[in-house]
């Protein structure tokens, strides 16, 4: 399994719609609002890196999403 956090900026006035749509994407385990440079964080789980990529791209194409930055968990 591959875990990642996607930091998301939303379009002004589209926050609620974006959060709802992000939460419906398969592989999204948790979605929550944050204060600061980003508006929303989504915790993801995917089978592997090849599965994670399309999942992140799908989130980035959702209505109201204007920017994403993905942080992939590494083993330590």
Where are the model-predicted features located?
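A compositional/biophysical signature of low hydrophobicity enriched in polar/charged and small residues
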Residues: 1-76
